[in-house]
Amino acid sequence: MKPAPTISSNFLEQIADPASRFYPGYLSYRNGEITKHELVARLPHVAMIGDSVCTGVYISSIWSTFWRARTCRGNSWFLDTNPAPPGIRSVSKKLEEFTPFVAIECAGIGALVDYEGQRQNFFRRILRTRNFSGQVGDLLATRRFPDLILISIGHNNVDWAWRSPRGELQQPESRLQRQSQELRENFARQMRRLIDHAGMQDHPVAVLVYGLVNFESYFQGREIAERLRTQDTSCYPHLETTYKYLTSFRPAYRSNLIRLARMVNEELRTMVEQSQAELSGNIQLRYSDALATADLSRAELLHPIDGWHASVEGHNVLAQAAFSDLGASLEFLGIKRPRRGGFQSAPF
């Protein structure tokens, strides 16, 4: 599913304030000098590239999962269009408190860090999954390239036990090394496409690459959910369904999944550091361990249906972690912290 931009709900009210930095544009719009589309193009644009960790989906029956995968938008730690409470205190809601902007949600269920042109399996095709290369391609095709790009993808790439030969299941070291290196190479290839295009823009572009989530603490919460289900089978009714999609989530394979995720995060960190020396002056590229260090050890952070994806509270934890490391990116784009906490907007 291709991304559909979401504009801040109160953006006209915000920029109608004479103190707003976008007020001159608002006057031009009100006087009929520019269209609403042209006015919106002047607002900061924030994009999210990712997998199901960045969406509000969860797994249940095949057809229900299929329907949610195709229709679920704006219900995650990045973007939530529901009122709060009881909605999610998403990154977008936090940003909306101090600047109007346009959110571009590219993330989707089942997305992989892939080799461009790689054929997808049947399951991903019917879900219309957009892998990393496809999501990057979507952004490159936009008429208004984003100012801020958040990237959190690769969680489906650490399913090391999937189709693993028996010998590698018992001695997985070479497989883990091979998978982490392959992910880095594919990730770097797509980052080069993204950065090359960003360098041609006439505005600053900040890219923030998040490490994979803290799987060690995540599985602590998952183990609690499993015990609860043992005591009451009505809890987490689709908890075991997880294993149909991610073999490595089985208890016997988790420790090496945790190892692989850490290896991947080190590869991503190194890749970002090595790329920084080659950037154009209008680009900032950073690695963040905010999600990799977030405490996900409570069962209530898991969705009550599948015990796999995040619950509303889980999305709140991820949102807070992700937002906490945005400061340097926002400052690069001209957003500064005000005297009383939060941030204030400067020109993009």
Segment roles from a protein language model:
Residues 263-270, 274, 283, 288-334:
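Extracellular low-complexity, Gly/Ser/Thr-rich intrinsically disordered linkers
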Residues 219-286, 312:
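Substrate-gating cap/lid alpha-helix
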Residues 1-102, 145, 329-348:
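N-terminal secretory targeting modules
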Residues 100, 198-205:
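A short helix->loop->beta-strand "cap" motif at the edges of active sites that frequently abuts
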Residues 64-192:
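Conserved SGNH/GDSL esterase-like catalytic core that processes O-acyl groups on lipids
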